[in-house]
Amino acid sequence: MELFTSIDSQFADIGPLLLYLIVGTIVFFESAVLFGLFLPGSSILFSAGLVAATEDNVDISALLTLIFIAAFFGNQVGFVLGRIFGRSYLNKRKSPGLQKVILKCERFYEKSGWWSVVAARFIPWVRTLVPPIAGASKMPYYEFLAANVVGALAWGVGITLAGYYTASIPGVKTFTYAIAGFFILGSIVS
């Protein structure tokens, strides 16, 4: 019996580490590369906040720091890929539907500039496409950097904290995993 107690205590910290790894990876890749278009970033953030509020071994400060870093560096990678490869990076995907979305994102960027980088964080697909568009359009690096910091904080930290504080609403805490699953499944289906 002591053997099972020992194994259980040795693996008790894997849950939070796995959560950090999954959330950080999804946030980074959704922000960094075109195949990230299909990842459910916002629902993952909200769900991670819900889980952090209900699990004592998940450190909300560590989670928020990881999310900010993953979102920030993900967008930086997207920007650099756009800067290096230009429009050809965006043309790799020949899907007519995706090309239509890319054109809309380019118009959004041309119209809104700095704010498009911040606002894009809150719009699925657009958050993946605007950084390489900004890079390909030769947006000044420090301008992008500032918008990226604001966007990563507002989106990554903001949505995660919304999930975290939602768990304090009576009745929500008992259904945290069902709610988290609903948000993740809903974003995958849509």
Language model region names:
Residues 1-25, 50-132, 136-143, 168-183, ...:
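Membrane-interfacial helix-loop-helix
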Residues 154-167:
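Transmembrane alpha-helical segments of integral membrane proteins
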